[in-house]
Design a protein with these regions (language model features):
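C-terminal peripheral helix-coil segments that are non-catalytic and often amphipathic
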Residues: 1-2, 100-103, 144, 148-156, ...
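Short secondary-structure transition hinges
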Residues: 103-145, 167
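Short amphipathic alpha-helical elements of helix-turn-helix/winged-helix folds
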Residues: 21-25, 175
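Hydrophobic alpha-helical connector segments
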Residues: 63, 78-108, 165-172, 198
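Helix-turn-helix
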Residues: 2, 6, 17, 25-63, ...
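Short, hydrophobic secondary-structure boundary micro-motifs
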Residues: 35, 112-116, 161-162, 188, ...
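All-alpha amphipathic helical-bundle segments outside canonical DNA-binding/catalytic cores
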Residues: 92, 137-139, 155-173
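Amphipathic, non-transmembrane alpha-helical scaffold segments
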Residues: 11, 61, 65, 69, ...
């Protein structure tokens, strides 16, 4: 039994090495140009080993996204508990989530860069719902968090509920994430070398609050 445990642990550790290595490569170079052979070389493994752990590149890409957003959700939940967000108003809770996204821009640009390219890559592949199930199960956790916020808003009236829950979630969370990804990757055109992206991001946050939160 101990032998089997050690074997399984070794497989898990090797999979994690592949995922972490692939994540860095995908974030730095985009997903499409990075081959499984390149991943294998950077892991100091044979490409056959990579394919044993992940049958296709698409499977690896989804595994990377799932692991990284699972880790981020864990960090989000830790901050949620530490700040006692459950006791906040809906507007304060919305600000909490937006601020955590802004923290991604400041502290984890690799995840933003990977995520921007992930959406493009998945859209270009023939991806089934079953293949996306592990990833979607993590994203559903974020959706459920926002559902709790929206229910709170129905009681305390600090966030508008004349706009549907889904509309606010997509307009705020997804649009904010998309904007942060563009700022992080530097693809927003600017002729001004001294342009203050963080100031612009805070202005974007203020715009959301002006529209969605009650005065």
């Amino acid at each position: 039994m101990r032998y089997l445990d050690n074997v399984n642990q070794s497989i898990t550790e090797r999979r994690d090495i592949v995922i972490e290595t692939a994540f860095k490569l995908f974030a730095e170079n985009r997903i499409e140009p990075v081959t499984m052979t390149v991943v294998a070389d950077n892991c100091n493994m044979g490409v056959a080993s990579i394919y044993r752990y992940f049958g296709t590149k698409k499977e690896l890409v989804i595994a990377v996204a799932t692991k990284k957003w699972r880790e981020y959700y864990g960090e989000l939940q830790r901050h949620y508990n530490e700040l006692n967000v459950e006791k906040m108003t809906a507007a304060q809770e919305l600000e909490f989530y937006i601020d955590r996204y802004i923290d991604l821009y400041k502290e984890n640009s690799d995840l933003l860069n990977f995520n921007a390219n992930f959406s493009i890559y998945i859209a270009s592949e023939d991806t089934t719902k079953d293949e996306m199930k592990p990833y979607n199960s993590i994203i559903d956790k974020f959706v459920n968090k926002f559902h709790i916020l929206y229910k709170k808003a129905q009681d305390d009236k600090t966030v508008r509920t004349d706009i549907s829950e889904k509309s606010i979630f997509y307009n705020v969370m997804y649009a904010m994430l998309s904007a942060l990804s563009k700022y992080s990757s530097g693809i927003i055109h600017s002729a001004d070398q001294d342009r203050n992206y963080e100031k612009e991001i805070c202005q974007l946050k203020d715009m959301y609050f002006e529209y969605y939160c009650r005065k």
